[in-house]
């Protein structure tokens, strides 16, 4: 039985949403942002790679001869469909269904940035020997710390349509690179 690219794309979408709601229901805590980032960095690329792999191998078993363009398309289209539907659904959920989850993610993002700034400051302070350098570091640290003032971060929103568009553009680069790999690896080589 041959599955078309839309079927594989929809299966990738379903798997992505299962992961998203799994984290939402079971990981909605003080580490929600970090858990989401780890899954986006490690689990989701593996999931999309498997979806593309099964799409290409299923097609190759059916037709036997496959060129670069066919293999590329069979890898890219399911990832694009699954990714687009997932991005749209997650955007709609965070912006219209549960805005508290969006607020929590935004807050945890800002707190993470603040913690990283403090860690860098403490490391740099230990390394510097000259008093002038330490004073300059303290001055820059205090300036940067001002950007985390509550009135400046209260309207910070990482989940705008614009940011989702930028993120999806970056993900499309991943899809293109991965599809190029699949197209090169799974095409039939002909000797002329």
Cite the ranges covered by each PLM segment.
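Transmembrane alpha-helical insertion/packing segments
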Residues: 1-65
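Juxtamembrane interface at the cytosolic side of transmembrane helices
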Residues: 2, 60, 70, 174-192
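Alpha-helical transmembrane segments of multipass membrane proteins
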Residues: 15-23, 47-48, 82-90, 174, ...
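Membrane-interfacial segments
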Residues: 26-34, 55-63, 93, 97-101, ...
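Hydrophobic secretory-pathway targeting helix
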Residues: 41, 57-61, 68-98
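Functional transmembrane-helix hotspots
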Residues: 89-131
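Individual transmembrane alpha-helix segments
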Residues: 140-173
């Amino acid at each position: 039985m041959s599955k078309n690219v839309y079927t594989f794309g929809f299966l990738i979408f379903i798997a992505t949403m299962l992961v998203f709601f799994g984290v939402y229901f079971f990981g909605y805590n003080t580490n929600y942002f970090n858990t989401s980032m780890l899954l986006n960095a490690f689990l989701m690329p593996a999931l999309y790679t498997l979806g593309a792999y099964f799409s290409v191998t299923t097609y190759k078993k059916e037709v036997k001869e496959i060129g670069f363009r066919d293999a590329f398309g069979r890898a890219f289209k399911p990832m694009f469909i699954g990714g687009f539907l997932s991005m749209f659904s997650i955007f709609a959920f965070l912006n219209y269904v549960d805005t508290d989850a969006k607020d929590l993610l935004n807050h945890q993002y800002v707190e993470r940035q603040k913690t990283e700034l403090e860690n860098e400051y403490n490391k740099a302070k230990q390394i510097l020997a000259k008093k002038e350098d330490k004073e300059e570091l303290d001055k820059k640290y205090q300036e940067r710390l001002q950007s985390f003032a509550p009135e400046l971060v209260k309207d910070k929103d990482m989940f705008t349509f614009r940011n989702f568009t930028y993120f999806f553009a970056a993900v499309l680069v991943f899809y293109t690179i991965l599809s190029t790999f699949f197209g090169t690896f799974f095409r039939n080589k002909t000797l002329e």
